[in-house]
């Protein structure tokens, strides 16, 4: 509401006397002469908590006209045909009056007259051929604007979680629903002429309409979605403006506010718009995908609109398969690191894309894609691992993997083999065995080679660990029993395997002499030669 059309009535507000005890005074009783200082001690001591509902109630969001009394007009169907347009306009003017629904018993008769008039207008526009004449266009648009355009209230719950909390519903919905229904029937009528409507439905009107998508009421957002889609379809001159402003709203949501209620509904509209893009795609549309759509994967409330977002991304790839590498690059960039539920959503979207990907594009993304999948199947969170392993249940994806098994198997095998021995969840272990069995059937020779290589690498890794432990034990022994004064630590003091370990792990590292017993740090150090030829000294681990 813009301002208030009514005033509060009742007894004049009495200012209470200053508090002389309580939190403002540290619990001490104050003398009368000290009262004047209470405000300075606690300037908010007189402020009483006011509920959010009361504050919204008092600060009107509509231009409510409580003084206007509506009069019951004649029925349109009982009026002569030549008099009907004038009566329709009169009823539309009558419906411009907005009532206060926060007071459920106020102006009940007028509210009922308006409700009946709206229902009658809906029936008239829907069932009467030629009902929409040029003279009623401004009256319809003005009535709609008066009813729906308003300042949306702040959320009653500052910690509102759309996934957990119930949304705040619009109290004036009994009238608002009928206004939206009337406007929708008006736009969808075969008698509607866009050439006349564009005089009244302009950029300013659309801008206000888009702002309403932040409404918490899902019923209103659903109507707005349909209305905006009809406007986009009928007014060609507004299409670029609508797309541009939606872009701006998304960018503000991602990079500034992180809060907007209508993302899902706007993405539904965009999904339909993208589906109608002509080929080849314009550069403007490709930029929209990369700069606007894909960053929508970042916000933490992704689950509220992920299905619609994934649909839009898939639509783009179906239109132009060459966009596939860019899409996967962005998905991997925004891949969640600490939120398992988001990771499951990302995996679902990847599978949707792989369902429609072309083999040539698949080959371009094998390395980054399957390295990420290897991380996912290794996840200790069983839902993430399970969702990644379900890719091997998809016949089309399986055929793509089979055609490129020589590239996929070396990436996936180490993770799968390790999980089959170590994962805590037996369901995951069973799924991994199925995948390994599939790999063995695809390319048995490569499978045997990978198995042998992996086992050999594991043995070498265990040996390196043993050598490392022995090395540090020798270091500790040298520290406890330093060599005689003047005697240097040479490689001959080390077992042959430890010398090999030094050469293997750091070919540029050579032992330094241990400090003499006469002073200095007795801990041995090593010198490491850098690529530039300079040397740095690093104390050995104790």
From Swiss-Prot:
Keyword Cytoplasm: yes
Subcellular location(s) per record: Cytoplasm
GO biological process, one term: P granule assembly
Gene disruption: observed consequences: Mutants have small gonads and the number of progeny is reduced. At higher temperatures, 20 percent of mutants are sterile with no gametes. Mutant embryos display several defects in P granule partitioning during the first cell divisions. Unlike in wild-type, plg-1-positive granules becomes unstable during mitosis resulting in their disassembly and in the loss of asymmetric segregation of plg-1 between somatic and germline blastomeres. plg-1-positive granules reform during interphase but are fewer and smaller.
InterPro entries: ARM-like (IPR011989), ARM-type_fold (IPR016024), PP2A_B56 (IPR002554)
Family of the protein in this entry: Belongs to the phosphatase 2A regulatory subunit B56 family.
Alphabetic keyword roster: Cytoplasm
Gene this chain is encoded by: pptr-1
Subunit description: Part of a complex consisting of a common heterodimeric core enzyme, composed of catalytic subunit let-92 and constant regulatory subunit paa-1, that associates with a variety of regulatory subunits which confer distinct properties to the holoenzyme. Interacts with akt-1 but not akt-2. Interacts with sgk-1. Interacts with P granule components meg-1, meg-3 and meg-4.
The name this protein goes by in its record: Serine/threonine-protein phosphatase 2A regulatory subunit pptr-1
Function per UniProt: Probable regulatory subunit of serine/threonine-protein phosphatase let-92 which negatively regulates the insulin receptor signaling cascade composed of daf-2, age-1, akt-1, akt-2 and sgk-1 by promoting the dephosphorylation of akt-1 on 'Thr-350'. Negatively regulates several functions controlled by the insulin pathway including dauer formation, lifespan, fat storage and stress resistance. Plays a role in the asymmetric segregation of the P granule components during embryonic cell divisions but does not play an essential role in specifying germ cell fate.
Residue span of region Disordered: 1-28, 500-542
Biased composition (Polar residues): 528-542
UniProt note on tissues of expression: Expressed in pharynx, vulva and spermatheca.
GO cellular component term of the entry, any: protein phosphatase type 2A complex
GO function term, MF aspect, one: protein kinase binding
Organism of derivation: Caenorhabditis elegans
